[in-house]
């Protein structure tokens, strides 16, 4: 089932036909803790959807309703208004939003993580050894004159969120090679919009997430580099975000959600669940079987996010002049 980008209604995807669920439990039914509404862009959603299909939230007494959103702005606005209980996105976007608004954000649970070795490897050739090394990548058309970070001077680049970590990583990579980024433009696009925009010439390069990135590469797009190899430090790359207000109102449900996510992440790291997870990715994103078969699945974090994983982000954003105010992260982790 392909997803149309935009603000989607609650998403219902049939569970796997196999009657044996990965999260089945012989224990008595848990206390009903109600429903949590989870917003996400399509690229991040499959892990949570797989958990829904496999009964992982039900095991903890939760119902999770996924909602597809087109952008970070929509997801964050939904957290503020209370339309969404959770939003899957990067910690850097949460810090950015907290700095630019009167919002008490909270990281509830991790999605995937990057290691120091992965970050280091992503700065070296070959950039595409048959699969992506990290989950977002700068791509250009096959015949583009852009070959390196320096060639991005005075170019237009499509990113998923303005002043996000991908934009930050590009600017840091350009600085590293002495490139002038002052006239490089960034336009906010969805993953689905990036390929067509590049083909039309609206942008010179794009930064899609997998599986959309792999789909473009299989269609002829050429890699330039990984922004996160220059922006990120080892630790959580994408997380489940909420607001302090929602946490206070639904503490028990959030505690159960946190436990369920860690179990889901553990299960997704097991080779035995590779096939069913890839089927979910195809179903949620509308990606082809050929694309999904090529994906390098990221390592899911099996521990709660620590302060050390996010402490660097405010200074990183300040150095890029994305934020100017101090951000207090002492209460930004749900414990």
Per-region residue spans from a language model:
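C-terminal segment of classical bacterial N-terminal signal peptides
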Residues: 6-14
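Short, glycine-/small- and polar/acidic-enriched structural segments
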Residues: 18-172, 176-177
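Solvent-exposed, polar/charged alpha-helical surfaces in well-ordered, non-transmembrane soluble domains
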Residues: 46, 54-55, 77, 81, ...
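A ligand-binding cleft/hinge motif common to bilobed small-molecule-binding domains
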Residues: 88-102, 171, 176, 204-222, ...
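Pocket-lining segment of extracytoplasmic ligand-binding domains
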Residues: 92, 182-187, 192-281
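Short, solvent-exposed loop/beta-turn-alpha elements that line the ligand-binding surface or hinge
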Residues: 115-131, 230-231, 301-307, 329
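Secondary-structure end/capping motifs
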Residues: 248-324
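Hinge/cleft segment of the Venus flytrap/periplasmic-binding protein
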Residues: 325-335
